Each structure stands twice: as structure tokens, then as C-alpha cells.
Amino acid sequence: MRTMRIPTRAHVRILIFTIVAVSLITLSLLEFGTTPIRNAICRSMYPEHMSRTVYIGDLAPSINASSLMTQFLAIREGRKVFSSIVPGEIIHQSWKAQNIPSAYHSLVTSWRSTYSNWTYVLWDNDNNRALVETFYPEWLKAYEALPSDIYRADFSRNLYMHAFGGIYADVDSEAVAPLDLLVKAQRSTGAPTAFLGAMETSSHDLHGIPNAFMAASAPGHPLWLVAAQDTVDWARARSWDRSIPAPGPEYVSGSVSLRRSIINYSPSVLETPIGGGSTHYYSTSNETIAPVVLFSPEVIYPFTWDRPRPHVLTATHE
């Protein structure tokens, strides 16, 4: 039998056509696919890598959550406490247990290195429940009624900020520059200031203020109570009718709930720019309430998690 050999040029054309077709399909899925599909593609093309930065020098001392709560509870009760921990200068991170995966260790170190003069605490599921039971017992029943631990973890982030101040950051995020001077400057004004970051997400504006980064110059900012109450109200309403399906955690205690709480607290945060083009944040215009600062996307979230941009991701790993 005689076989016909396809010319090399034809091979090249077929290869180019295949590459173009696959690229177009992938881009279409990234642009118009559902969020789970986009996330799966993002992870396959740009897997999560540990930071390539090697951190040397001092690291923020670590304290366990139980000790932190004990010290702040003593302060709240008016007892004298001799401690190096400064309210508003605490790095908070959370995981379901104390054994954070090794892939995140260098990212965690980035926060302890960048804020070496602060105090670091890692919260887990047991610590979160203890925090609610000790500091916010009136919400414990609602907390336990939430559908799962991820709802409770999101809820607890608001309480870290209200009870202790400082910065909360997801363990898969990296600190590349300090914000401590800004936080300290706001603390000097007297009223606590809340800090959040905007993201240009492709999903919807509802998801445009993630709770992966949250900061407070001092304990006691009322926004965090508004956000926590938003979740508590949902949990209590659902307790009357368990047939109500639970939406995703972002709607109950995550980013959507946070944005809704900001609107209830001070809608001007989302619409009032401060200064000119060189200023990268927005703030409340109502001087009678504790201020909220919303950083523009390039400060905290320079790229989105549901639509990768190769040139940005490449830059983060160089």
C-alpha cells in the first residue's frame, strides 16, 4: 500500500490552526464562562506558586490567639497589662488549623517581615469560636447556625478588626510594601479608620471589595460591627425557616456582605474620590462617623483572581 506524505507546510498550517482554535476557545471561556470554569482554567495555566522572595532580618513575633484574647480581655476589664502588643499593630491570618500548607509559608513570612515591629497571630476554627464566645457571646448562637466553617471564618475577620485592629490578610497573599505609616497617621487623628481594597473583578461589582485584605488603625471601628450584624441577621432569619437555601459564603459573610455593609454604613465610600489622579484611595465624606478608606485596585488588588493577565502574573514572579 502506498501512503501519501503530507507536506511539511501543511503540517505547520494544521499546527497553527490548532493553536489558534484552542487559544480562542480558552479566551472565550475566560471571558464568558462561569466563575468555576474560569477559576479552573486560571489554576491550570497559572498554578499557585510560593513567593520566590527570600526574607531575611527580623520577623514580627508570633503570639497564639488565646494569649491575645486574654490580654485584650484584661484591658477591656480595666486590669493592668504589661505587654509589647500595640492595638492596631497586629497581623491577623487564619486557617482551619495551625498547620498552614508549606506552599504558603514564604507568603506568611512576607507579612511578618514587612511588619516586623508588629505582632503576628494565626487564627484557626477553634480560636474563632472562642473569640465569639468570649467577646461577642450574644452572637454565638447565630455563629454556630452558619452553614459551614468558611462562613464562620469570613465572619470572624470582621471581629479581628473590631476587637484588635491591625491588618487581616489571606495566607495566599504577599506583602510587597508596608502600609504601617498610613495606619499610624490615621490612628493619630483619634477616631479609628478602616481600610479596604477595591478590585476590578469581571464577575460583578458586588464582588469588587474582597475581604482578603482588611485593616483598622485601632480597635472599635463601627463598620466591622455593621458587617458582622449583616451576617447575624441572615443567620437568625434562616433559623426560622431551614428550607431557605444558603447562598455562597461571599453573600452571607464575605465580599458581597462587606460591600452591602459599606453601603449601609456610608455609601460615599464607593463614590467620593479624594484628590487627583495621583491619589489611590477613596474615603468617607461624613466627618461625624469613623472614616473608611478604600484603596484603588492597583494598591491592594492589581489583578483579579478570575481573569488572569500573563504580563501581570509574570511580573509578580520576577
Task: Give the location of each predicted region.
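Glycosyltransferase-associated regions of secretory-pathway enzymes
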Residues: 2-153, 169-318
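Small-residue hinge/turn detector
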Residues: 154-166
